[in-house]
Design a protein with these regions (language model features):
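Short, basic, helix/turn surface patches
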Residues: 1, 50-61, 76-77, 128-132
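Conserved Motif II region of HX4D acyltransferases
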Residues: 1-8
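Glycine-rich beta-to-alpha transition loops that act as phosphate-gripper elements at the mouths
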Residues: 3, 27-30, 79
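A general structural-boundary detector
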Residues: 4, 23, 36, 69-72, ...
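Class I SAM-dependent methyltransferase SAM-binding "motif I" and its flanking Rossmann-like core
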Residues: 8-69
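A contiguous loop/helix-start segment that scaffolds small-molecule binding in enzyme catalytic cores
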Residues: 71-72, 76-168
């Protein structure tokens, strides 16, 4: 289900058709991330669609990249990995970053839960989700990014290290 080419290898079929000179016609189709984005209540004028995160290799660096995005970003996730992924996102993006988890978009048991990454991580640690999952995460705010970089080597500090703002 869904739109071919969105988080699946459908683009390879379209590319091969183009290579062979065949016409590719597209129609609007269902994609879970658009209604999840709109119902999240997070800014949706600009956004980044990630799809599924890498399961192992490259996952940490991808999460770091996503954490720095200044726009709302969207991932698809397996119900079995959801709690772990939310905990990782809370660690990398910060516990207080707003987010939402939507499941079973356009189906009988459609639900959307909104909160902070920390709240959502704790909720889904206890209550395992089922179905197709879309996670929508707020982009970083400028102050948050400055604080992360300022305290990169002192993550427990609220203020810059002594002398770090000395100008020569």
């Amino acid at each position: 289900a869904g739109t071919p080419g969105i988080s699946d290898p459908g683009f390879m079929l379209a590319r091969e058709c183009r290579r062979r000179g065949l016409k590719v016609e597209t129609l609007p189709g269902a994609t879970a991330f658009v209604p999840a984005l709109v119902s999240s209540g997070l800014p949706c004028d600009r956004f980044f669609f990630e799809g599924f995160l890498p399961p192992k290799k490259g996952r940490a660096s991808r999460l770091e990249f996503l954490a720095e995005l200044p726009v709302t970003f969207i991932i698809y996730e397996s119900p079995l990995r959801l709690a772990r992924t939310l905990a990782q996102l809370a660690e990398v993006c910060g516990e207080n970053r707003p987010a939402s988890v939507s499941r079973e978009i356009s189906k009988l048991h459609e639900t959307t839960v909104r909160g902070t990454l920390g709240e959502l991580a704790r909720q889904f640690e206890v209550n395992q989700a089922r179905g197709e999952i879309v996670v929508v995460i707020s982009g970083r705010v400028r102050e948050e990014a400055e604080r992360r970089h300022r305290n990169k080597y002192r993550p427990d500090a609220d203020e810059p290290a002594p002398g770090s703002n000395v100008q020569l």
